[in-house]
């Protein structure tokens, strides 16, 4: 998937694949109905839409993290619920945000039309954490959420983040010379083929960025079932190095 081609596809998809705001709100209400840990917030976009975020404050904060989920999910779904609470437990306050969703029949390529919207959501989430006093802010993103974060870090002139964790990203990286913060690329040895096959290319690119590394979790699949403690350890080890106390 190339972003140059993606621009053309996105123009087409803007007409064929409008965001499903009703589905997004249903996901939000389902999330709120079962929420146990964290505080819900709403962030206001320029067009008037208000999207959900789940803020979990760390008792002894070492940094703050924006968490972005994969295609069609929600900020407390499965892996994302575990990550936002596990990271908060070890000192990283988390803001897990609702990313744009399309109708359930949409394919991954259809989501190219939502990347401008996801850029705005990342910017609002980072600004919100900064306003809460976050001095060191990272993005932790999974699957399509990682692809969206890649786009944000490339095309936003002032992304205002200090590190990026991409978990099981679903394509190769583009224009990495634009990214100036340490990057962790982590995926499973039994991950989706589109993630595994791009691993060598990603490693070659992130080696050019100081403080970056790649971790392959042996035996893990795309959602890291049975390997989430290992995943969390890898993320925390990276964040501790990339976001040193000041």
Please report, for each region that a protein language model flagged, where it lies by residue.
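Short beta-strand/loop motif that positions the catalytic acidic residue
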Residues: 179, 185-187
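Short, surface-exposed "cap/lid" segments of acyl-processing enzymes
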Residues: 50, 56-90, 95-96
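Short alpha-helix in the alpha/beta-hydrolase fold that links the catalytic acid
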Residues: 80, 181, 194-205
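Alpha/beta-hydrolase active-site loop
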Residues: 108-132
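Acidic catalytic loop of the alpha/beta-hydrolase fold
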Residues: 189-195, 222-223
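N-terminal cap/lid segment of alpha/beta-hydrolase-fold proteins
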Residues: 19-59
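Catalytic histidine neighborhood in serine/cysteine hydrolases
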Residues: 206-223
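Gly/Ala-rich beta-loop-alpha elbow adjacent to hydrolase catalytic centers
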Residues: 140-149
């Amino acid at each position: 998937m190339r972003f140059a081609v993606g621009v053309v596809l996105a123009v087409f998809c803007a007409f064929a694949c409008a965001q499903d705001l009703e589905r997004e709100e249903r996901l939000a209400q389902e999330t709120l109905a079962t929420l146990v840990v964290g505080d819900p917030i709403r962030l206001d976009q320029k067009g008037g839409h208000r999207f959900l975020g789940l803020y979990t404050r760390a008792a002894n904060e070492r940094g703050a993290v924006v968490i972005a989920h994969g295609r069609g999910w929600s900020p407390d779904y499965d892996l994302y619920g575990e990550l936002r609470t596990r990271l908060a437990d070890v000192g990283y306050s988390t803001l897990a945000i609702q990313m744009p969703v399309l109708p359930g029949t949409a394919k991954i390529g259809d989501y190219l039309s939502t990347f401008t919207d996801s850029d705005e959501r990342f910017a609002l989430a980072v600004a919100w954490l900064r306003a809460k006093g976050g001095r060191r802010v990272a993005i932790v993103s999974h699957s399509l959420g990682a692809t969206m974060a890649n786009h944000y870090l490339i095309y936003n002139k002032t992304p205002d983040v200090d590190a990026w964790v991409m978990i099981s990203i679903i394509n190769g990286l583009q224009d990495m010379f634009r990214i100036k913060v340490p990057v962790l690329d982590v995926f499973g040895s039994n991950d989706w083929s589109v993630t595994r096959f791009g691993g060598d290319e990603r490693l070659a690119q992130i080696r050019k960025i100081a403080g970056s590394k790649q971790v392959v979790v042996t035996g893990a699949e795309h959602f890291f079932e049975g390997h989430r403690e290992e995943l969390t350890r890898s993320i925390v080890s990276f964040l501790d190095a990339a976001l040193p106390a000041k």
